[in-house]
Amino acid sequence: RGGGRIVITASTSGINADPNMWAYNTAKAAVINLAKGAALDLAADAITVNVVCPGPTETGMTTGIKQVPEVYESLRRAVPLQRWGTAEEVAAVIVFLASQAASFVTGAIVPVDGGITANTGQFMPRELPADS
């Protein structure tokens, strides 16, 4: 029998650092590298290990950010898709990585971030039309 799936949640802050968040950035980068090392060590046992890195996501943890509209909007504008993600969108990726369909995926870092990690930061993405 054997085998299995491990899906770890980190953050886009572990891929691209955020200002004034040194400890958080470091912790999330460590989680990503922990998962990559585990993927290598557990592959012989047919256990896959992958990381999901959410970007700005509407959750209980981010509720306070909505109380500061200029911060919330600044983060929204930094997302190329021009919106925050939902917990359901993150969960869908986790469900896939935990499924048999992902049996050949291991050591992957999967951003679920509306394109934040695709942006080098050199240019801000253009605003999408309001009806998008």
Q: Can you name each region flagged by the protein language model?
A:
Residues 27, 35:
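Active-site helix of classical SDR
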